[in-house]
Amino acid sequence: MNKFFLIGIGGISMSAIALILKNHGHIVEGSDMQESITTRMLREKGINVYIGHDENHIKGDEIVIFTAAIPKDNPELVKAKRLGLKVYERAEFLGMLMKDYKNVIAVSGTHGKTTTTSMIGYILKKALLNPTVLVGAFVKQLGGNFCIGSSEYLVVEACEYVDSFLNFNPSIGVILNIDNDHLDYFKDIESIKDSFRKFALKIPQNGFIVANLDDENVYSVASYLKQNVIYFSTKTKADFWADNITSCNGYYEFDVVNKDFKHLCHIKLNIPGFHNVYNSLAAFSVAYTLGIDKNTIKEAIFEFCGASRRLEKLGKIDGIVLYDDYAHHPTEIEATLRTLKKLAKEKVIVIFQPHTFSRLKSLMEGFVKSLSLADKVIVTDVYAAREKNVYGVSSKDLYEKLKKAGVDCEYIDQFEKIAEYVLNTAQKGDIVATIGAGDVNKCIELILDKSPVKS
């Protein structure tokens, strides 16, 4: 039995690690900057959580785990290093945990990791393979942001930021897509592709890689690999491809066909959006290659009802439907808005909170283009996350560019005022959606609290 201290324990991934360690019989505690539903839940599970960071929290007998978002001058991290304690970055520690599992399925990609990881986890669970699953969101069908199973299968998200996934040693890899992101760390798209190439090369010869044939960047990485690469596509013949794709109000169904043109099964999705055709094809490809019965896969995908903050319907007031989505990249925003436009009876009103100054600066034109799909955009202040604003950019710059592009938009800096504005302007049949990876979803809570009418 060891004692662990997690700096940033309230994070979605760190809280899952904390609970896994607790389940394995270790003593676990940690700290976070603010109280949250997660920190309260951890205390209920018997994990001590400090609010705020203080060097006195470190006693000298702990193994310390921290996230990439923790600054180097964090007092707990500084003291742990000064005392010579074992200190691990989150991804590094996860890589060590993986050694305990026979089959590690690591899902990578700029977009869609959480949904695809959750879907694969649920398929394996339905197939009675008793997987351990670690995801970046709450998933109803997994009972949380993780589930503990046997040491046969571990399903985990693999993030490229600061090359985190290069700490992993998966036996099965998934590459959903490769896009410009995290440009505070990566120099350009070529350096991002190089990181994914290194990730793919970690897959052993007796494993396999599932890759998106329709993504040019993915194909340029996968086509040079000597490992077993299994391609999926919605556009052309592949190992697994979607044929006869149809949709009704934003919900898709399709036939899965293999490279020999054999019809395997018909998939019907219970989560909206064309992007989920890709996510479900990737999940199908992994599960079918593992030997899981196609009907079990089909049933699991149909039953899968999504992850928190992924086009999540949060309520309805007087005919106005409220959604929240984690999209924080132009490609994701475009996919989300195209889906919401199909779901909406009237207007789509977006409350957008940019996530990090560096992303806003580097992808500004992409944000303008993608947000232009909305009927109305309310821009609020940047969620800084790990950053200080050394980029000379703000949400007001985005607001001005949207106005110049002819987008109906407002800049409102306080969530309370946003809630009041929405309640005064939204009409029956409209969809109101918070979009962003920060805390913009609090606006929905305020709208629901302030609304005199519930429906």
UniProtKB/Swiss-Prot annotation:
<dbReference type="GO" id="GO:0008360">
    <property type="term" value="P:regulation of cell shape"/>
</dbReference>
<comment type="function">
    <text>Cell wall formation.</text>
</comment>
<keyword id="KW-0436">Ligase</keyword>
<dbReference type="GO" id="GO:0005524">
    <property type="term" value="F:ATP binding"/>
</dbReference>
<keyword id="KW-0131">Cell cycle</keyword>
<dbReference type="InterPro" id="IPR036615">
    <property type="entry name" value="Mur_ligase_C_dom_sf"/>
</dbReference>
<keyword id="KW-0133">Cell shape</keyword>
<dbReference type="GO" id="GO:0071555">
    <property type="term" value="P:cell wall organization"/>
</dbReference>
<keyword id="KW-0573">Peptidoglycan synthesis</keyword>
<dbReference type="InterPro" id="IPR000713">
    <property type="entry name" value="Mur_ligase_N"/>
</dbReference>
<dbReference type="Pfam" id="PF02875">
    <property type="entry name" value="Mur_ligase_C"/>
</dbReference>
<keyword id="KW-0132">Cell division</keyword>
<keyword id="KW-0547">Nucleotide-binding</keyword>
<dbReference type="InterPro" id="IPR013221">
    <property type="entry name" value="Mur_ligase_cen"/>
</dbReference>
<dbReference type="GO" id="GO:0008763">
    <property type="term" value="F:UDP-N-acetylmuramate-L-alanine ligase activity"/>
</dbReference>
<dbReference type="InterPro" id="IPR050061">
    <property type="entry name" value="MurCDEF_pg_biosynth"/>
</dbReference>
<keyword id="KW-0963">Cytoplasm</keyword>
<dbReference type="GO" id="GO:0005737">
    <property type="term" value="C:cytoplasm"/>
</dbReference>
<dbReference type="GO" id="GO:0009252">
    <property type="term" value="P:peptidoglycan biosynthetic process"/>
</dbReference>
<dbReference type="Pfam" id="PF01225">
    <property type="entry name" value="Mur_ligase"/>
</dbReference>
<feature type="binding site">
    <location>
        <begin position="109"/>
        <end position="115"/>
    </location>
    <ligand>
        <name>ATP</name>
    </ligand>
</feature>
<protein>
    <recommendedName>
        <fullName>UDP-N-acetylmuramate--L-alanine ligase</fullName>
        <ecNumber>6.3.2.8</ecNumber>
    </recommendedName>
</protein>
<dbReference type="InterPro" id="IPR005758">
    <property type="entry name" value="UDP-N-AcMur_Ala_ligase_MurC"/>
</dbReference>
<comment type="similarity">
    <text>Belongs to the MurCDEF family.</text>
</comment>
<keyword id="KW-0961">Cell wall biogenesis/degradation</keyword>
<dbReference type="GO" id="GO:0051301">
    <property type="term" value="P:cell division"/>
</dbReference>
<keyword id="KW-0067">ATP-binding</keyword>
<comment type="pathway">
    <text>Cell wall biogenesis; peptidoglycan biosynthesis.</text>
</comment>
<dbReference type="InterPro" id="IPR004101">
    <property type="entry name" value="Mur_ligase_C"/>
</dbReference>
<dbReference type="InterPro" id="IPR036565">
    <property type="entry name" value="Mur-like_cat_sf"/>
</dbReference>
<dbReference type="Pfam" id="PF08245">
    <property type="entry name" value="Mur_ligase_M"/>
</dbReference>
